[in-house]
């Protein structure tokens, strides 16, 4: 059904917050990598729950597709408008609504950026642990994909810090789930159902988040190894040592070299084949003791060195390279980002498989990621392949990679979500009964199937989405 522009204008009267047709910027109609494109008839910037509710009520009554969007940093095409309709951009709903220091919670709107929330609470002696690599991502987006990041090995992921949500269902109904209480054994946990649903079940309008005290001290350590296998195997020993690291990252030397050139800095021990980058936080004496324990274990298990990054400039440079690895690869060639997760004990097996696949196929695959939780980030590099060859070889190799991940007990995504790019692999590898249950929940909450249709687990609507 064609949009009734006058109806939308009655909901959002400010012409600067309602764009249509050719006035919609191109970046709103593609993914952040610029590879998947869609189209929409309207782009709305609501400022309140009431406006979101009114827009969804209109869309539900007239069966108009709606694509929720936060900061637009998603890497798997979750915010691409596949079926036209309305893009619902929540980026201007970005306020802190309440800081409750007694319950150690903060209530924010979904458009607030992660980096702004972290700065706000840390200035007040508090700490929001989830730490996805893209600091300019939105809190609503983080919750919608259950984003994790480097601190997940110690602190957990976004789901672990959501106490409550205000959401708007597809028909405009406003619903509160969760609350400031610590325990809740009352009925189904609707909050957990909505977290990670990628905008397919409801639109988040308020986020009640759990905070912890800001750590007193923090220390990062760079541990070089001759090869990646030795480094990954030593991680299991470190994790069993009760040293409680905040982050345990692994990087192959070949991707670090790209990051060094991109950032204009150098890592120590360029003779290494891989690096493990760790952080410890907590009380000063606890940090010192844990680092000393890990130093001994690492050197006993093949580490070439144990470099404490006590110099603030050096530490910042080392972490800047780690944070820029995807962009560093992208600067050299188009690439496909992957964030498969396997059991920690199978991380080395999966990387061994990927290295073999790279050698067999001739397609470069550089790996890094969160060794502490088995989340492997791959950059699959296009190189000089023409479009037809790139698409064919990419999908052939990704079919094999995802199949191996599932064989090892893993899943398609640790933190990016399924969106479009992982959808074909997810649908093939997920049990029919699970998909039927997910789609039944979708139909119950969104009977018209207007919210972010064709994404993630959905098997209705645009069934061809996700192949690009």
Q: What do these predicted regions represent?
A:
Residues 1-468:
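Noncatalytic alpha-helical scaffold of FAD-dependent oxidoreductases
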């Amino acid at each position: 059904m064609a949009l009734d522009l006058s109806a939308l204008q009655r909901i959002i009267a400010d012409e600067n917050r309602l764009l249509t047709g050719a006035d919609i910027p191109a970046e709103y109609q593609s993914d952040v990598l610029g590879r998947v494109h869609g189209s929409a008839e309207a782009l709305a910037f609501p400022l309140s729950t009431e406006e979101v509710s009114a827009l969804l009520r209109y869309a539900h009554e007239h069966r108009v597709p709606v694509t929720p969007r936060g900061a637009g940093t998603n890497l798997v095409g979750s915010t691409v408008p596949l079926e036209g309709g309305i893009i619902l951009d929540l980026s201007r709903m970005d306020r802190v609504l309440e800081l409750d220091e007694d319950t150690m919670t903060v209530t924010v709107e979904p458009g607030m950026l992660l980096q702004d929330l972290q700065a706000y609470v840390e200035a007040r002696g508090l700490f929001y642990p989830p730490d996805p690599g893209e600091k300019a991502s939105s809190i609503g987006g983080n919750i919608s994909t259950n984003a994790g990041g480097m601190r997940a090995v110690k602190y957990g992921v976004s789901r672990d810090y959501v106490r409550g949500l205000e959401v708007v269902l597809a028909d405009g109904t406003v619903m509160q789930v969760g609350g400031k209480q610590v325990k809740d054994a009352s009925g189904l946990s609707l909050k957990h159902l909505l977290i990670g649903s990628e905008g397919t079940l409801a639109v988040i309008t308020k986020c009640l988040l759990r905070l912890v005290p800001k750590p007193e001290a923090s220390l990062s350590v760079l541990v070089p190894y001759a090869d990646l296998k030795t480094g990954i195997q030593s991680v299991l020993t470190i994790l069993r040592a009760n040293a409680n690291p905040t982050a345990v990252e692994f990087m192959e030397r070949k991707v670090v070299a790209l990051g060094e050139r991109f950032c204009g800095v150098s890592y120590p021990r360029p003779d290494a084949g891989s690096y493990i980058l760790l952080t410890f936080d907590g009380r000063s004496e606890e940090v010192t003791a844990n680092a000393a324990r890990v130093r001994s274990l690492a050197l006993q298990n093949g580490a070439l060195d144990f470099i404490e990054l006590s110099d603030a400039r050096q530490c910042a440079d080392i972490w800047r390279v780690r944070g820029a690895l995807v962009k560093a690869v992208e600067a050299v060639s188009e690439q496909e980002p992957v964030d498969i997760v396997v059991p920690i004990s199978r991380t080395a097996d999966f990387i061994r498989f990927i290295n073999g696949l790279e050698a067999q196929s001739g397609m470069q695959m550089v790996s890094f990621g969160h060794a502490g939780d088995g989340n492997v980030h791959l950059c699959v590099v296009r190189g000089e392949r023409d479009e037809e060859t790139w698409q064919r070889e990419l999908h052939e190799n990704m079919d094999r990679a995802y199949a191996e991940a599932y064989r090892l007990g893993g899943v398609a995504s640790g933190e990016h979500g399924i969106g479009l790019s992982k959808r074909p692999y997810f649908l093939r590898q997920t049990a029919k009964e699970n998909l039927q249950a997910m789609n039944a929940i979708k139909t119950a909450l969104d009977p018209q199937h207007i919210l972010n249709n064709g994404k993630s687990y959905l098997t209705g609507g645009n069934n061809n989405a996700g192949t690009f």
